[in-house]
């Protein structure tokens, strides 16, 4: 028996189909393409059928691709949207998730584990790969804005992650926000890289 092989890579154009397999396997044009934080709300609304996929493809061609895909034995199983906070319009304009200081952090805004692969260790590899991507790009720290649920969360809001998940990945609470997810307050958690 061979040991499991885990890899995480930025979602460059050549890995776009793997990203889509995780986040939107059926390729539904109006389904989530992880754009709501990356584009202005009016831009997202104006995108017609098929345009959301194209908008995400364009983001994958930028200097900082918009996230990472984790593979288990060659199969894409996880997605993490991460990038410099300064390049994420919804965060730069947010009155609910304000910067805690002037450190030019990278921000985790979405974590998705593909159906059929949850509770198999994907998240640990995914977050470690996301942090490595940020560190390799010169980020001094990575932030996330999870919740601290008393039990299991509704899957539709679980993309923000949980305090426990980020603590296991070496993050610590550095502040609070005025934002909520699934009715729960969101925290500011950080992992320093320098």
Per-range role (PLM):
Residues 157-164, 168-169, 175-194:
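C-terminal "cap" of GNAT-fold acetyltransferases
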Residues 1-38:
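Conserved N-terminal entry element of GNAT/NAT acetyltransferase domains
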Residues 46, 58-62, 71, 75-118, ...:
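Conserved acyl-donor/pantetheine-binding loop and adjacent beta-alpha core of acyl/acetyltransferases
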Residues 33-67:
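Active-site rim helix/loop that mediates acceptor-substrate recognition in acyltransferases
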Residues 117, 121-129:
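Conserved acetyl-CoA pyrophosphate-binding loop and the N-cap/start of the following alpha-helix
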Residues 66-68, 104, 183-189:
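Short beta-strand micro-motifs in enzyme catalytic cores
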Residues 127, 134-157:
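Conserved GNAT acetyl-CoA-binding A-motif
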